[in-house]
Regions:
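Conserved alpha/beta enzyme-core scaffold
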Residues: 1-122
Length: 122
């Protein structure tokens, strides 16, 4: 994964969480070292990709999909459309292809939404 491998946090200091972890003091306050989580595989759902793996997400899919992809050793992206390299506007790309190892085309994805369910009266 990419990003910060570890960070110091005050959360958990003085609790069971802190046992066995590195403890340091900064400006008179204690912090514990937390190592980042790295996933083996990150599965993301994107609207569109180019053949280089650059991805465009729609709406709230922009929230956690890029983070999931960058935190994983391998990212597999399911996309609705694959276009040629250069067809995506660079300003529209949410995740660079450097983080994507596989692209799977699903042009007609099942749209899972909540459905109204009513109790049948006997």
């Amino acid at each position: 994964g990419a990003g910060i491998p570890a960070f110091f946090t005050a959360t958990g200091v003085g609790t069971l969480i802190a046992e066995g972890k590195e403890l340091r003091e900064f400006n008179g306050k204690e912090y514990i070292l937390e190592h980042a989580l790295t996933a083996d595989v990150g599965l993301v759902k994107a609207y569109k990709a180019d053949k280089a793996g650059n991805l465009i997400f729609r709406k709230t899919a922009q929230n956690f999909n890029p983070v999931c992809a960058t935190a994983a050793k391998i990212c597999i992206a399911e996309v609705e459309e694959i276009v040629e390299i250069g067809e995506l506007d660079p300003d529209d790309i949410h995740l660079p292809g450097i983080y994507v190892q596989r692209i799977i085309l699903n042009a007609t994805p099942e749209k899972r939404i909540e459905q109204l369910t009513l109790k049948v009266e006997a």
